[in-house]
């Protein structure tokens, strides 16, 4: 009897975690199911631990992910070292092959919803050493303070300090980087930070060396409207759901779950900040194919108290899509990846449109069978294709 019950429970658990309906267009569905199941198991463990008062949701996932970190080991192609730029930990990847000329420099910012991840995580270490070797570039992969221990603007400030340090002439010279060929890149929350620091840099008169390019990989760019079409469609998208993304956004600003609840209802922007909604109005910024089903409605005004306590969600340093056109106009050549089955899809699409409207040179790669986090799954054919296209653009433009 006991064995039968155990078997039954096992079958139910396997079915629960492996029953993940996927869009027909997604390639290698079983691999995607397994990856999504692992994410689901991790978030369920974190939720259970939080419910019991054992640990904060994000701290549990941080612990689980720490087992996937790797040491800064050099290989036959790349020398890897760790240091600090203005007290911010960074991992540096330098190609071993001799070069008579100065190399490109790429400053990379990892994703993880401002709460998770590190330059040492195996997926980011793999990406950085691959990029350094294939691009023949010096890659700096930066860390930054994570929530819930640190909230906005700590993440932005850490990344900006680290980038400013890298852009000093003597630092670039030390690592053999051509000051005319430096770019910034990041994925997801890292794409958010990459966009934000790039905007800040063009307004900083103290930084003489400017970025040549920015490459944003499925970036998160706004927290004002949590009900854009991709969010409405994305309750069951692989890896990143709407509810998890809202949790990441709210944790970026505070551990107060009241903000999360308001964001889930899309009732967090106060009336006095409603003018900012013009910058995220998907009815005018999205391609027609995404405007057919849902009908655009202005979010219901929220509490002024929330915005006063946690002003980050209406701050351009946290939400780069809120930048004025006169700032966007000065941005460098830009590459943006968006994925069809990603709750952040529309953030990227709206940014593409706004940059095009002000004359920025934008290359937009929309992946029809893509989903959030693909770069972090090196075993997928789709991941390899996307990374190769990313690399090709960097080779031509950086």
UniProtKB/Swiss-Prot annotation:
Native source species: Mus musculus
Catalytic activity from the UniProt record: a triacylglycerol + H2O = a diacylglycerol + a fatty acid + H(+)
Membrane topology: Single-pass type II membrane protein
Keyword Phosphoprotein in annotation: no
Entry annotation: catalytic residues: 188, 342, 372
Pfam families: Abhydrolase_3
Role: Displays cellular triglyceride lipase activity in liver, increases the levels of intracellular fatty acids derived from the hydrolysis of newly formed triglyceride stores and plays a role in very low-density lipoprotein assembly. Displays serine esterase activity in liver. Deacetylates a variety of arylacetamide substrates, including xenobiotic compounds and procarcinogens, converting them to the primary arylamide compounds and increasing their toxicity.
Subcellular location: Endoplasmic reticulum membrane; Microsome membrane
Gene, per the UniProt record: Aadac
Glycosylation (residues): 281
EC primary class: hydrolase
Protein name: Arylacetamide deacetylase
MF terms (GO), sorted A to Z: deacetylase activity; lipase activity; serine hydrolase activity; triacylglycerol lipase activity
Segments on the Cytoplasmic face: 1-5
